[in-house]
From Swiss-Prot:
Biased composition (Polar residues): 43-52, 120-145, 153-162, 178-189, 237-253
Keyword set includes Acetylation: yes
Biased composition (Basic and acidic residues): 204-229, 306-315
Annotated region (Disordered), positions in chain: 37-63, 115-270, 283-321
Name of this protein: Uncharacterized protein YLR257W
Keywords of this entry: Acetylation, Cytoplasm, Phosphoprotein
N-acetylvaline PTM positions: V2
Biased composition (Acidic residues): 284-305
Origin: domain of life: Eukaryota
Amino acid sequence: MVDARGSTPCLIGDSIRNVNDGNSLDFQYTNQFNEESEASRLLTPQTSSNHALSKMQKDDDIRDRSYTSVAELNREGALLTDEVDLENVDASKVRSNRDDLEAEEKRKKLLLLKKKQRNKSINSESFSSPSLRASKSNSLITSTDPVEDHISKYSSSGTPENITGEADDEDEDIIRNSYGQMIKNNSNRPHLAKGESYQSAEQEIDHTAPEKSEKRQERSGRSFDRQKSSAEFLRSLSRSISRGPTKNKTVSPSKGEDSRMYSTSNYSISLVDLENGPKIIPETLEEEQEDAEKEGVLMEDEGNEEYTKDLEEAANKAQPQ
């Protein structure tokens, strides 16, 4: 920092903050530059605004045309400001909650109307001729599960009978399977809560059914197969229990030690025979070997086997002389 006289202040024993540099050349040049820039800005305000606008336009040209900036909307008057009369805003296109409620009510009415039409079509199909229903049931493609399991009776003319009266018990037992065939409903048998069992239900089915082969062909919830498999399982279980070893076997005191038995799941032997087993087996093998030697079955390895005279004579004749 140099003052007007060209000398530098001495900082020995003093601080730089206490130095008066108002007369320095650097301070005078800085103040003069700031005053000139402020005067030029005050004299030409229109020029600065035009420069800013041109710069914005250049930026807009460079930017993507599909994007609209907030500044553009504000210049065009698209944004609501304090200068706009908010009371005169056109709100005719704004949807209210009342319109939503009316639309919801209309939608519910349409759904109810469609449901009624569907019920009418189902009722009309149920009153159709039995021949048409039979032709539909024969096809696996067109057959569907019925809405109601109750099947009404038809007269020879094709009109339904006993529609208003009470349904018979036979009709309640008849249902339609997934193939469209009419079968008896035996899915609720046996009724275990009433004390029935699978054996009683199987006997009842065999007694009431005219032919057993036809009963097996019906698909009544596979109740017949379940009853049969359960009966077979019970029989096999009783057989396996009867084959098992007798746990409560009494031993008579007169037999003594010979009555002690070694039992397994399949057989039982005496403990005496079990202890004497290693001695009995070699004796049995020796006896069998002696019997075989007596019968002439075994041959010695030394080559001094004894043959009968007939065999020796036949062998001598066969040898070439």
